Amino acid sequence: MSSLGYNILYNLINERQDTWCERIVYPHTNSIESNNPMKNFDIISFSLQFEEDYFNVLKMIKQSGIPLKRKDRSENDPLIIAGGPCATANPMPLSDYIDVFVIGEGEVTINKFLDIYLENKNLDNFLDMDGIYIPEFNNNAKIALINDMKNAYHITQPIITKTDKEDYKTVFSDSIMLNVSRGCTRGCRFCMSSYLYRPLRETTIKELVNIALKTRENTNLNKITLIGAAVGDYYDLEGLTKALESEGFQIATPSLRIDSLSRETLETLKKSGLKSITIAPESISTLRERINKSISDEKIFSVIKNAVDLDFNIKLYFLIGIPYESKEDIEELANYIEKIANMHKNRNYIKFSINPVIPKPQTPLQWEVYNFKEIKSKTRYLKKKLRKYNVKFESPKKGLIQYILSCGNREVGAVIEKSLTEEVTLKEWQSYLPNYNINDELPWSKIDIGIKSNFLKTENRRLKTKKQTPWCGDSPCYNCGPCN
C-alpha cells in the first residue's frame, strides 16, 4: 500500500467516470472501501514489488474462490492482471496464473487498457499496446514508460486510511510522497532498478515545491518522503532540501547515495527533522569495483563521521556472495564493518544489514548463479565474527528461494502453487535452480525493457575484470538502448 505506483493507479482509475477502484490487502480478500469480496470485481490487479509477493498472490486468488489457474477461469471470473518491477523484469513464474502483465509504468497504459476492456474484453484486443504481456499468446512486449516527468502523474491528494488495523497502516501514511525522479543510470551491476526504468527522468525543484505545497493544503501533512530510485543523484539535492526546508517541511528519504551526502546536505536534513539515514556501501572497495559502485573508502568514512557528529542513527547495507568474492574478501569485510561500528561510542546507533546478492533478470548478473553452500558458510563466519555488533542477516535459504523466483521460468509456478498446501523441501527448491549460459535464450526474452543484450553481456565481462563503467550522467552515452 506504500507503493507510489499503487497510489498513482488508485487515483487515476477513480478520476474516471466509468471506473471505480478499491483496495484489498493481504491476508484479506474483501475490499477496504466496501468490504466487497474479491471475486465480485471485474478486474483484480496485483502490484508485485518483491518476489515473495508471489506466494500471497496465489493465496489470495485461491482463498477468494476464483479458479487459481487462468486456463480454468471463465468469462464470469475477474480478469487478473499484475504489474510492478517483478512483473516487468520476469513475468514467467506466475504466467500460468495471471491473465495480463503490465510491463513498465502502469500510468502510461491504464487508461487505454480500461477503454479497450470496457469496449471488448477479449484479450487479443490488448496485443497492439506497448507495456502488455499476455501469457496465453506469449507475445513480445515492449516496456511502457513516461518520457518526461512533466507528463508524470504527481499525487496531490494521497490516500489516507484512518484505521487502527495494523494490516492497513502504510510506511508513508503520515507523509507526502514526493516523486523526485524515476530511473537510475548509475549501473550498479546487481541492481534491477539500475536497468529496468532507464533513462533517468527528474522533476524540477519548482514543480516539486508546488506539488508539496498543494498536497499540504489538501491534507495538512507536513512531512515529505523523497521517492525515487536515484534521489541521491538529483541534479540539485541540496537546493531541493533547502527549498523544502524553507517552506517548513520535514524531509525524509528511504535511502541516499553516499557520494551525494555532503556535510551541508546532512545538516539541512537534520535541521528539517530527519533522525536516521540509510546508506549502502555494499562491500569492500575491490568488490565494489566488480559491481560498478566506485565510491572510495575515504568518502564512506567521511559521510559516516559527519552523520555520527550530527547525531544521526545510521543503517548500512552490505552484500555477500558477489561473484568472484573470496574467503579473504569476507574476512576483510568483517574487519571493515567492525571499524565502522566502532566509529560511534554507542554501538546501538549504527546498525548493519547483510544480505546475499540475488542475481536478477534484466541485469548483468542474470547469468550468474546463487551459490547456496558458499553463502551459508560466509553467513555463519560473519555471524560469529560480528556477534557483538548490531547486525541482521538475511537467511541464505530465503535468498535461494528469491533467486529461483527472480530468474525462474514458467515451471517455477508449480512449486509456488505446491507451497500453498504443503512444505516444499530445500532439495525440491534446489531442483528449480536456474543455470544459464551467456548465449542462452532466457525465460524473459519476450520482455523488451529497452536495454541491449550486448550491453548487459559487456557489463558481465567487466564484472569479471573489475572494469568500471562510469555513470552516463558524467560520461559520453554508452548506447545501452533506452535513450534511443
Regions found by a protein language model. Give the residues of each.
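Local cysteine-cluster metal-coordination motifs and their immediate loop/turn environment
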Residues: N179-Y195, P470-N484
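N-terminal [4Fe-4S]-dependent radical SAM core
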Residues: P135-M177, K452-T465
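Radical SAM enzyme core and accessory elements
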Residues: K385-N484
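Short secondary-structure boundary/capping segments
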Residues: I8, I61, D96-I98, Y117-L118, ...
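Flexible glycine/acidic-rich beta-alpha junction loops that bind and position SAM and/or redox cofactors
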Residues: Y235, E264-T265, R288-I291, I320-E328, ...
